[in-house]
Amino acid sequence: MKSFLAKKEIKLSWNNYLINAMSHMALGLFASLIIGLIIKTMAEQLQNLFGEYTLFLFLEELGVLTMGLMGPAIGVAVAFSLKAPKLVLFAAVVSGAAGATLGGPAGSFIAAVISTELGKLISGETKLDIILTPFVTVLSGFVTASFVGPWIQTGLQSIGSLIIWATEQQPLLMGILVATIMGLALTAPISSAALAIMLELEGLAAGAATVGCAAQMVGFAVSSYRENRWSGLISLGIGTSMLQMPNIIKNPYILIPPTVAGIILAPISTLLVGLINNPAGAGMGTSGFVGPIMIFTEMGFTLETLIIIILLLIVAPAIISLILSEWLRKIGKIQFGDMKINQS
């Protein structure tokens, strides 16, 4: 059995599904729901400023269409991550769509994983491969979406609602907790974006999550500037702090500055500023400026919101992280080169 599974490139491990597949799910989300929401928001604001010109209406329609194709995008992304053969990969479009329709993003993910692995099992095993492989893939995807998807979506929504409610009741403690967990998830090989969307984080909880994620990205970008210079500043600051993961394993002390920055700024976000966000922006931090764009969407395109974003997501985490990292360098806990990232 092990040799057969190995031949089919089926790896039954948490790492393969919760890290590898979920990371690719996040790419599918970004290529559909998130980019679609950005396009739609941009088109709406252009209409507010200049009127309902044909181009702006076209962009709004494009954004809505792109958002609606979240399920197929997740299906293909997950199947690709699991090294699916061509027929399985293409059929996973249907599995992802069915999962999204019946169970939301989480349902799409589960349906895509199960249908892809079952499709891989039968792929190339019969002379009717061109019929049986896509049939097994779409059938198993739809069955999974129908019976498992709704339960998973309901469960995750309940957890998300509990987090949102708890953050509103205890903004200090929960703000810190949400910011820390989501920030660490962004830096670790876990998709904070997918997690936020599946939990449907919104309001103060989503705002705290954004602050925590931004603190990791901006914090690492600034505190490692002497090693990585401008290219690292951009890669970490608007790319992903996950690039520091190999260095964190070697020296966990480098994780302290950005994490502490998130802990300090989270209560300011929840108690003083009342920063809010939506599920699409909650787990993104400053990556591609998606977090700030979604904050504008929720809080309005105003000068006050711009100042809040600049201070809470960029300036404050940069200053706090730099002060702490320089202190850790001074006492010998961080050495030059400890935060050098591979950019080749």
Regions flagged by a language model, labelled:
Residues M1-S344:
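Pore-lining transmembrane helices
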